[in-house]
Regions:
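A short acidic, Gly/Pro-enriched loop at the edge of an enzyme's catalytic core
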Residues: 1-11
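Short, hinge-like loop/turn segments at secondary-structure boundaries
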Residues: 9, 58-60, 114-117
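Residues lining the SAM
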Residues: 13-17, 43
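Short conserved AdoMet
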Residues: 21, 35, 93
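A short glycine-rich, Lys/Arg-flanked "PGG" loop and its adjoining helix->strand segment in the class I
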Residues: 24-39
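Conserved catalytic/acceptor-binding region of the Class I
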Residues: 41-110, 125-128
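Core SAM-dependent methyltransferase catalytic element
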Residues: 91-94, 156-168
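C-terminal helical/coil "lid" or tail adjacent to the Rossmann-like core of SAM-dependent
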Residues: 95-153
Length: 168
């Protein structure tokens, strides 16, 4: 980062650390640009417990796994949320505040068809789905499964963390 970037009251990010090769180093560079008593806050998704509650929804379960396998194939850390507290501590941020929230969805109200549709080319590029995989068939199977099985499930977890940076 340029040294003349300045100082900020807060630095926030969402779903970015999971895609960085060295998130701790990135945060280390960022906190140098915090004002005294500045806040650094991040929210990251995590695949922990994904699919819990959806035992009667095998197509939904497969869709969740395809999304996470694609992110992982692209170099994303699908468990970064669980690591945030330790990373903040290693940066010298004392007593960071951390929360986790389950992203609950239902068979009839979820974003898995949309996610699959926008990620389909990425899924194909990483061989997560075969060339014969069709969105129309997938959507039909998901819709039929939702009509037959009313269930709620955890799609993923959101981890949020914030703390005050150290200033030397």
């Amino acid at each position: 980062l340029p040294e003349d970037l300045g100082k900020f009251d807060a630095i926030v990010g969402r779903r970015v650390l999971m895609y960085l090769p060295d998130p701790q180093r990135a945060l280390q560079l960022l906190i140098q640009h915090l004002k005294p008593n500045g806040i650094i806050a991040f929210q990251e998704s995590d695949a922990i417990k994904c699919g819990v509650g959806g035992d009667r929804l095998p197509h939904h379960q497969e869709a969740i796994q395809r999304v996470w396998k694609t992110v992982q194939a692209e170099g994303g850390d699908i468990h970064i949320g669980q690591k945030l507290y330790d990373i903040f501590l290693r940066l010298g941020i004392e007593s960071p505040h951390i929360e986790a929230e389950a992203v609950m969805q239902t068979a009839e109200n979820n974003d898995l068809q949309w996610l699959t549709e926008i990620m389909i080319e990425r899924m194909r590029a990483h061989h997560i789905v075969d060339d014969d995989f069709t969105l129309d068939q997938f959507k039909q199977e998901m819709t039929e499964e939702a009509e037959e099985n009313k269930a709620a499930f955890i799609r993923d977890m959101n981890f949020g963390i914030w703390g005050h940076g150290l200033f030397l």
